[in-house]
Amino acid sequence: MPTDDPSDRPSGLLDQLSRLIETLAELDDDNGEQHGHSTIDRGRTRIDYDYAVSIGLGSDARSPSTPAGNADDAGDAETAHIETRASDDSDDLVVVADLPGVTDETAVDAAVEDTGALTISVGDDVVERLTLDDPGMTITSLTVTNQILELRVTPSEPSATDT
């Protein structure tokens, strides 16, 4: 892959074309895909992220009968990325999940089981199961926008016997 060192940058048109062909050949060796993972720490906030870049020349591996964003693709638990964080304005827990392949027509559901596990389902497939600290938590909102699920989970109210 090209480096950011100015002395390594091609200067002429032929050098630039040569470097481009080399880069495309490297991508071709990797089936046109690059994957990575990284973490950013900002004070008390930690962000883990994954990325995948795919470059091709128009030849799609999908068959013509399988449209992009098929709900079957969304059930792959390996591609679902989940992040949890405390809400800034309440005691709620916010769960954000990247669900590739989910469309507006795809059934997405979440439930808190009696065991305290939060399950996220796409269609009939459970794509993620998270253990919650409080088994009495309640899901107060569920939205899916652009293949991103956002859940707000509220802790159970303390009963009169807990005080």
UniProtKB/Swiss-Prot annotation:
Family: Belongs to the gas vesicle GvpH family.
InterPro entries reported for this sequence: GvpH
Annotated protein name in UniProt: Gas vesicle protein H2
Function of the protein: A minor component of the gas vesicle, also found in soluble extracts. Proteins GvpF to GvpM might be involved in nucleating gas vesicle formation. Gas vesicles are hollow, gas filled proteinaceous nanostructures found in several microbial planktonic microorganisms. They allow positioning of halobacteria at the optimal depth for growth in the poorly aerated, shallow brine pools of their habitat. Expression of 2 c-vac DNA fragments containing 2 divergently transcribed regions (gvpE-gvpF-gvpG-gvpH-gvpI-gvpJ-gvpK-gvpL-gvpM and gvpA-gvpC-gvpN-gvpO) allows H.volcanii to produce gas vesicles.
A cellular component annotation (GO) from this entry: cytoplasm
Keywords recorded for this protein, A-Z: Cytoplasm, Gas vesicle, Plasmid
Gene name of this polypeptide: gvpH2
Quaternary context: GvpF to GvpM interact with each other in vitro, and may form multi-subunit complex(es). Interacts with GvpC. Might interact with GvpA.
Transmembrane segments: none
Source lineage: Archaea, Methanobacteriati, Methanobacteriota, Stenosarchaea group, Halobacteria
Other comments on record: Encoded in a 14-gene locus called c-vac which produces cylindrical gas vesicles only in the stationary growth phase.
Pfam families associated with the record: GvpH (PF05455)
UniProt keyword Cytoplasm present: yes
Region listing for Disordered, in residue ranges: 57-92
Main location: other
The keyword Phosphoprotein appears for this protein: no
Compositionally biased intervals (Basic and acidic residues): 78-88
